[in-house]
Design a protein with these regions (language model features):
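General beta-strand structural signal in soluble alpha/beta enzymes
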Residues: 61, 111-112, 143-146, 166-169, ...
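Glycine-rich, mobile lid/loop segments that gate access to catalytic sites or pores
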Residues: 36, 112-133, 147-157, 169-174
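Conserved small-residue-rich beta-alpha loop and adjacent elements
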Residues: 47, 51-54, 58-131, 135, ...
Length: 244
């Protein structure tokens, strides 16, 4: 909760850093939307952190137990993973998401963001470390790595330091990490979202859904990529969709 409060209090510093990152990009690149922070998006990140803080503690839960014939009690208990490595692209909100989730689940995290979000991520992690220090927690349990691509190769072989590696981003990034990492990998979804328009669908409502699923934020990984249309409704639906 303190992290969410601190994020809102230090919003100007985060916005200044984000402007530096945006100024270094091609202004016509549609992917800049992934990098962009504004007041509302920062408030949304803070709200997400508050939701995470209210999640039940996932550690220390007894999943199963049984007693052996010799009297030994055997229990399966949830424990932290340890140190989580995260590789992700130019989405500053991911820095806060991963840090908050790892702290809630009593894991440390090593963050490898993209060069595009360098200044934003630095300020974000400085803010996180400030809150950790104020609560007498080890500040290095959230660590930001240099943004150079060479660092990724080092993460792949860091079996002594990382317990799991999580890539978050495009399908090409996820597959590259999965194929090359010696550290165990948790593979996330890569988007490629589909919308299916059924033959009895209400055309106006279906059009609204398809347009919103793509146009509202084209850069996010859960934006629609493929529209499948039943052949019985295809002529009418596709004509209306094309007219948009």
């Amino acid at each position: 909760l303190q992290l969410a409060d601190a994020l809102e209090q230090h919003m100007p510093a985060l916005l200044r850093a984000n402007k530096k990152d945006l100024a270094a990009q091609d202004p016509d690149n549609p992917r800049n939307d992934r990098l962009l922070l504004n007041e509302q998006r920062i408030k949304n990140i803070a709200a997400s952190i508050r939701k995470i803080s209210k999640l039940p503690n996932p550690t220390g839960k007894i999943i199963s137990k049984n007693k052996l014939k010799n009297g030994l009690q055997v229990e399966k208990i949830t424990v932290p993973l340890g140190v989580v490595g995260a590789i992700y692209e130019s989405r500053p909100n991911v820095t806060f998401d991963i840090a908050a989730l790892c702290l809630r689940s009593q894991n440390g995290c090593v963050l490898k963001g993209s060069q595009e979000a360098l200044h934003t991520n630095r300020v974000a992690v400085q803010l996180i470390k400030k809150v950790l220090k104020e609560n007498d927690l080890p500040v290095d349990c959230v660590t930001l790595l240099p943004s150079e691509r060479e660092v990724v190769q080092q993460l792949f072989t860091a079996t002594r330091y990382l317990d799991v590696l999580i890539p978050r981003g495009s399908d090409s990034l996820i597959q590259y990490v999965r194929k090359n990492s010696l550290v165990p990998v948790i593979e996330t979804g890569a988007g490629v979202c589909h919308v299916y328009v059924e033959k009895d669908a209400a055309i106006n409502k279906a059009l609204d859904i398809v347009v919103n699923a793509k146009v509202s934020r084209p850069s996010v990984c859960n934006a629609v990529d493929t529209v499948l249309v039943d052949e019985k409704i295809a002529p009418a639906f596709l004509q209306r969709l094309q007219a948009l």
